[in-house]
Amino acid sequence: MKLHITTFAALGLALISATTNAQEHNIKYLGDHIYLQTEVNGKPANLVFDTGAELIYLDSTYVADQNFNFKLIGNAMIDGAGSDGPAKTKIIIGEVTVTASGKTYKPEFTPLVNLRPLLGNQADGIFGMKAISGKIISIDYKNQTLSLHDKLTPQMTEGYTCIPVKIKNRKILVPMTINVNSQTTISGDALMDMGSGQGIEITSPTATKHSLDKISDKTPFAFSSGGLGGKSAGYTINIANANIGNIALQTQKAAYSTDKKGSMASADYIANIGNKIWSQFDIILDFANSKIYLRKN
């Protein structure tokens, strides 16, 4: 999911505990989302693992159901995926503690947002990348584990393909080529977004640049989820093939956005890539060296 805070930019997440050993998390892969099984202030919480987000977010319904008594509340502006633009939302300041597999994270602030209309009723919040981007992160969809390592060893990458990437504001941009048809090829950086349950979603500036509106065989879509999702619309089209680096993807469908605002109207990347693609692979994320490693699972 593509989310960013537009105020309080200097604040961050404090990692309370650290380890030199691999830390393994059991995850659930449901509805094309990765769920980390955590505790929030001592109460169970399923947080969506999201490489497209930076912070930890909590769902407003989850917070109400748990009867948390947070006292330090502020406000911030947050952009979402849809076309409504930034929205004012409440933030909890310094009172949230998240525990996962024995490790504790205490965000300096936590946005309180209406996530379930966008992600589903299983989602109690989002776990973004700021808290763990200093680690090597390995994700195994089939065996449903996510592991954090202090360093990358040659044994860990056996059988994987290394792909150099760009890291901007803890977001991962991967090199991508989309062959729409014999006349249209789209190449550039695409956002790695494990918070998305979709496949390849082409941004509206890229769609306009390549005249995708002229494709006649397409299916419209639109949603208005409320919360961070806002309103979003576009079309699903057939494509010939697509690659990440030199790795061919198993898909012959893509969507393109017609949004005028929001992250799908961004010119910073050509497309957003969600879990319908990433679940085809075992994955290792190496932020420090701007690399990811992929292996067909």
PLM features: what roles do these ranges have?
Residues 21-297:
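Pepsin/retropepsin-fold aspartyl endopeptidases
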Residues 1-25:
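Bacterial Sec-dependent N-terminal signal peptides
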